[in-house]
Regions:
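Bacterial replisome coupling helices
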Residues: 11, 69-183
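Non-catalytic protein-protein interaction segments used by genome-maintenance enzymes to assemble
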Residues: 1-80, 100-101, 105, 136
């Protein structure tokens, strides 16, 4: 008699991954950065090479992830302690379970820093793309609503849509350059 519990578990995890890929990507990125906080500076430099802004709290959608990234950013801004040591000393108590999960995910992290850097860069570009696409979609709905109500503020929505469209272009160009480097 086949076991029913195994397939249902697999299906359940696939559904969770399909429902929220952004959370999984954020989780992975933080799991690497918590182990190797020095990669934050290197990621910032790479993003700037592509004409993009450095990593920011806004790159993360989830509050816990934002709080943890703020601790990482603070660690990079101080030079009294080793960056990793600083991070672990400043993590709020309520984030300890999240940090333990992150550390467990990357317990056997053995990739060279350059490979991790390229991987993280690609994932942060994806996160920014998800965010920008979501904003463009919302703005289009708002623009349609505004147009139906007389269109007094439509110019604002058009300008914001154009800004996110330019960002999407920049992200696509960066992703293309990155994929050429990896080839």
């Amino acid at each position: 008699k086949p076991r029913v519990t195994e397939p249902s578990r697999r299906t359940e995890s696939v559904v969770v991954a399909a429902v929220n890929p952004r959370k999984n990507i954020e989780f992975y990125c933080l799991s690497v950065l918590i182990r190797k906080p020095d990669l934050v500076y290197r990621l910032d430099r790479k993003l700037e090479e592509f004409g993009l802004s450095p990593l920011a709290t806004e790159d993360f959608e989830y509050t816990d992830h934002q709080l943890l990234f703020n601790v990482l950013r603070q660690a990079m801004g101080q030079d009294e302690k080793d960056h990793a040591q600083y991070v672990f000393s400043q993590i709020p108590e309520d984030l300890a379970p999240l940090v333990n999960e992150l550390l467990a995910q990357t317990e056997k992290l053995e990739s060279p820093d350059d490979k991790l850097l390229e991987d993280l860069l690609a994932r942060f570009l994806d996160l920014r793309r998800f965010h920008a696409m979501s904003n463009v979609t919302q703005l289009k709905f708002m623009q349609d609503d505004e147009q139906q109500q007389g269109g007094e503020n439509i110019k604002v929505y058009i300008e914001q849509t154009m800004r996110f469209t330019r960002l999407l272009n920049g992200l696509d160009q960066a992703k293309l350059k990155l994929s050429k480097r990896q080839a």
